[in-house]
From Swiss-Prot:
NCBIfam families referenced in this protein's UniProt entry, alphabetically: cyt_tran_rel (TIGR00125), nicotinate (nicotinamide) nucleotide adenylyltransferase (TIGR00482), PRK00071.1-3 (NF000840), PRK00071.1-4 (NF000841)
Gene: nadD
Record's function text: Catalyzes the reversible adenylation of nicotinate mononucleotide (NaMN) to nicotinic acid adenine dinucleotide (NaAD).
EC class (word): transferase
EC number(s) from the headed UniProt entry: 2.7.7.18
UniProt name for this protein: Probable nicotinate-nucleotide adenylyltransferase
Amino acid sequence: MALELLTPFTKVELEEERKDKNRKQIGILGGNFNPVHNAHLLVADQVRQQLGLDEVLLMPEYKPPHVDKKATIDEKHRLKMLELAIKGIEGLAIETIELKRKGVSYTYDTMKDLIEQNPDVDYYFIIGADMVDYLPKWHKIDELIQMVQFVGVQRPKYKAGTSYPVIWVDVPLMDISSSMIRDFIRKNRKPNFLLPKLVLDYIEKEGLYQ
């Protein structure tokens, strides 16, 4: 099985390989970010640190194949909340390629375009442990695994296995979801400490998720 658990030895190997190639190492964390919350930021930052990446890009989807459009607010709000969430955070940035392209977002198409635009970059595509099980169903997955290195975020007590090459990273568990935050707001419960204060202030100012 091409299953790899991140260890100090693995990290050294990755760093030595990067020195030889002298290429930028960029992580990608895609999502609807409806809204972005602290667990998103924790995952992005921990993967960046543990793999020694130059940067992790948070990439909002325009119209993902698996999300009901009715449940997704306008992309201008999701983008603004991302901008507020990463303000002043080193090593995190935003990639808007899918918002600019519009239409349904397939990872293969997005990464193909990014690689063509940035031939000197190696990309690490970050997914949750539960998503690893679904890799065989991803659009053009066999081509995609030749283009990017998948990074699986390990969850406590969750054992995932795959025949695809995945680097596993352990990240502290934060049981937070965007749907939980939206539900809090609909019930007039303030979701303090679940997302950055600047994001919560924006949600309240714009009257989102009411």
